[in-house]
Amino acid sequence: MNSLLIMGYTSFDLGIFNEKDIKVSIIKKTIRRKLINFLEEGLRWVIFTGNLGFEYWALEVAKELQTDYEFQIGTIFPFETHGQNWNENNQIKLASFKQVDFVKYAFEAYENPGQFRQYNEFLLENTEGSFVFYDEENETKLKNMVEKMKQSSNYEVYLLNFEDLQEIFEEMND
């Protein structure tokens, strides 16, 4: 696989409001393992959409892994205005999404809901697979995108769920 889209729950979805929360370290450990597997299989591009939570933690891990693996990181934001109303702490995280190898904006500004459909289609057409933190028992707005991913032919979907995280947590405590 050449390019991998990373998406998942936001920190708000997960009820995580402190970066020092133990859940963050469990999630990051899981991300690290999975990304290393992808990279050792020849992954060349990791693509983000600029969301807080899972994506941001994956971005941090990916940036750390760039010291040992040769791959590119890209962020394709839906709009140039993405994150403009975020607080100061989150603005720092937004800046981190912009300090990667490739940054593009699908649209200048929001005009209509159809832009999200076009944006999602673009992401699916320009990546070969996805690594998504999503559990079908805990639905969010990611549901439609995950369904589109699964329906796309020749598109690999790797889902991370809460059960996977529980296994990592138990491993850490052994």
Swiss-Prot record:
It comes from the Bacteria. InterPro entries: YspA. SUPFAM superfamilies: MCP/YpsA-like (SSF102405). Pfam families: YpsA. HAMAP family: UPF0398. Belongs to the UPF0398 family. This is UPF0398 protein LACR_0544.
